[in-house]
Amino acid sequence: MNAYQNKNITIIGLGKTGLSCVDYLLSQQANIRVIDTRKKPTGIDKLPQNIPLHTGSLNQEWLLESDMIVISPGLAVKTPEIQTALKAGVEVIGDIELFCRAATKPIVGITGSNGKSTVTTLVYEMAKAAGVKVGMGGNIGIPALSLLNEDCELYVLELSSFQLETTYSLKAAAATVLNVTEDHMDRYMDLEDYRQAKLRIYHNAEVGVLNNEDKLTFGEGENQARQTVSFAENSADYWLKTENGKQYLMVKDEVILPCEEATLVGRHNYMNILAATALAQAVGINLDAIRTALRHFKGLDHRFQLAHQANGVRWINDSKATNVGSTVAALSGLYVEGKLHLLLGGDGKGADFSELAELINQPHIICYCFGRDGALLAKLSSQSYLFETMEQAIAFLRPTLQSGDMVLLSPACASLDQFASFEKRGEEFTRLAQCLA
């Protein structure tokens, strides 16, 4: 008999991840109930009709009758109803914990405030280039549990702090916390609380890939890997060499690739490449495959992506910059020939925006702020304008554009105050760029 057969398991949250939990636990002959606090949750039409469903609230009675609760990453463990269940002795885990208990092949785990989707996809592409049967999922692409149905030799998982909170059995072959900057401060008590959730990725990890430029990423206590390697611009195992005006991606004394041969550009992307290379090498992927991937990888949608170019003006879609740290990374080392027209705004999730002030208070940067926290952002710069929507901001700035200028959407905020997702925000920016430019 398997561990879940005939157990009463309540799954909280539908959507892709919730449905993957339903499919997996049905295959394990568990007795399943599903709860979703939304009245009409996504995926309700795909739920088998014989599965009991409660919507609109958390059903405390169901929770207390459970042997186990599989909680959506979107619901905090400190929610009173969940705390009541925990105190009654009910086990509470997430989908990643279910996956880790079942997976038999090596796992590369990637978390961080910024860059994790790019690094996850890079490692995946490096493994593919080496001929490895690799599956990618977690907080990106498909739910981790769905990967169990594929013939994989390696799993590459992007993991959020929310997912790591309810994961206990991860034993990553290689793991990294890319960086730690304020994000989800509406969910965590403070930055340290958020950081500790991230550091869980190192628990029982074989190799930890550390960012030598961010000591907050270093493991501590039981959350430390058995071995570590480091990446940084200088003084690290994986580093950036500048010689005769050219830059090179390095591992120790060996050139990985001249930066000009990589399709990704910008200092923050070079750090992403170094981290991905370290992770890939930690699981045995050779440098030739790594180089092939780096020469062909085009980057991800909504991550500092060229959306449109006309009349000497570049429109850059960085809608995935949903926190301050991501926008700081985009602006650091950014060269613009003319003016930089920066679109900021949305839901800041309680973050401290002050770190942006020094970067954006420059003669060539003009800020156009919108959305729920637009007014707060507008106060940071002496050259700022405030609008209700992004569309109004773009309509206002368009007539002022000159050759050499850049329009950058790097909002430092979540999108949900005005858009269904950061992808929808990026798509709207691209549409406006192309029709108004």
Swiss-Prot record:
Recorded catalytic reaction(s): these are: UDP-N-acetyl-alpha-D-muramoyl-L-alanine + D-glutamate + ATP = UDP-N-acetyl-alpha-D-muramoyl-L-alanyl-D-glutamate + ADP + phosphate + H(+)
Q: Which Pfam families match?
A: Mur_ligase_C (PF02875), Mur_ligase_M (PF08245), MurD-like_N (PF21799)
GO annotation (BP), single = peptidoglycan biosynthetic process
What parts of the sequence cross the membrane? Answer: none
Q: In which pathway does it act?
A: Cell wall biogenesis; peptidoglycan biosynthesis
What EC number(s) are associated with this protein in UniProt?
Answer: 6.3.2.9
Q: Name one GO molecular function term.
A: UDP-N-acetylmuramoylalanine-D-glutamate ligase activity
One GO cellular component term noted in the UniProt record for this chain: cytoplasm
- Which PANTHER family has this protein been placed in? UDP-N-ACETYLMURAMOYLALANINE--D-GLUTAMATE LIGASE
NCBIfam families linked: murD
Q: Which family does it belong to?
A: Belongs to the MurCDEF family.
Q: What is this protein called?
A: UDP-N-acetylmuramoylalanine--D-glutamate ligase
